[in-house]
């Protein structure tokens, strides 16, 4: 029996999308049929109050891209992200997480 031919995905991207968009926040939710990934940009946190008057910190976020994928795609997505994260850290060192509570990157 002949081996299965290799499958190669040839990705194309429009000139409008080649630059990409910046995102520093990811929201994920799902239905029985798909996962939705909302990539967003956060703004500086602001003190505020909830409906009962309790103090809250509000972080305005603007969604810059929404991606919907079927659940079956998530396995390959997670595998690919993990492989790339390992490669990144092998090349550049471990990624340092910001301290808990930091919701907006400090000025550099």
Model-predicted segments: where are they?
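N-terminal intrinsically disordered, cationic/polar leader segments
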Residues: 1-72, 76-108
């Amino acid at each position: 029996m002949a081996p299965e031919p290799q499958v190669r995905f040839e990705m194309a991207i429009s000139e409008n999308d080649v630059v990409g968009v910046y995102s520093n926040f990811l929201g994920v939710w799902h239905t029985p049929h798909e996962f939705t990934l909302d990539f967003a940009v956060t703004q500086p946190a602001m003190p505020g109050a909830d409906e009962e008057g309790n103090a809250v910190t509000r972080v305005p976020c603007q969604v810059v891209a929404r991606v919907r994928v079927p659940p079956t795609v998530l396995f390959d997505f997670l595998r690919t992200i993990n492989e790339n994260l390992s490669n990144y850290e092998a090349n550049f060192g471990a990624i340092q997480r910001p301290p808990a509570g930091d919701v907006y990157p400090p000025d550099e």
